[in-house]
Amino acid sequence: MKIVILDHPRENPGEIDWSRFDEYGEVVRYSDRVEDVASRIGDADVVFLNKSKVTKADLEKCPNLKFISVIATGYNTVDVDGARELGIPVANVPSYGTEAIGQHAIALLLEITNHIAYHDAEVRRGRKNNDTDWCFWDYSPIELENKTMGIIGLGRIGQITSRVAQAFGMKVLAYDSFQNPALVNENCRYTDLDTLLANSDVIALHCPLFPETENLINKA
């Protein structure tokens, strides 16, 4: 069996041991990306990838291919419909980095409301010690208490973000095609997209990239 690993440094910056795959056959790793993906996976039985794009035309050149593993949650890099037509299963990692990504969303929110990086840089360059005022006040902090967060996509990551937002005293408006009544409470409710956009102080996008969600937030 031949196993091909595309995007190798991205999938494994160094802490993952891939040697166990050697037990199953020949393992080929690529550390750069090329347009002609089929030239690298044409004789593969199994393919691991992250950002490399694989089209149906590529898959049609892979007569031995039996399985594709996308080492990420999003799988828009693979023509899934084309793979299905050719009988090639495609797997992803549905709960990859859920807590970390939700935490990162809140970190970005706090940066916007408190300008932490800016003030840190100002203190490091000595402004605090050299300023004659009691404090420098370039930006007013924005308190999250009683603000409204709109969350588009209340899946695993959206739920983490919602939970932390509510802990800050925020109200949550959620828009999702699949509604879970168990997530509704006095501080969190589902609504339509127009209502969410009109009533939110901040909006978090936690939906997968599909044709129907692409450019969901636009100038209009």
Task: Annotate the PLM regions.
Residues M1-A44, L173:
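N-terminal glycine-/charge-rich "phosphate-binding" loop or analogous flexible N-terminal tail
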Residues S31, I71-A72, I88-E99, D194:
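Short beta->alpha connector loops at strand-helix junctions that form conserved
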Residues V54-L59, L173, S177-A220:
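Rossmann-like adenosine-cofactor binding region
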Residues N76-I88:
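Rossmann-fold NAD(P)-binding glycine/threonine-rich loop
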Residues L86, P94-T148:
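Phosphate-binding beta-alpha-beta segment of Rossmann-like dinucleotide-binding domains, i.e.
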Residues L154-G155:
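Glycine-rich Rossmann-fold phosphate-binding loop(s) that bind the pyrophosphate
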Residues G158-Q159:
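N-terminal Rossmann-fold NAD(P) dinucleotide-binding loop
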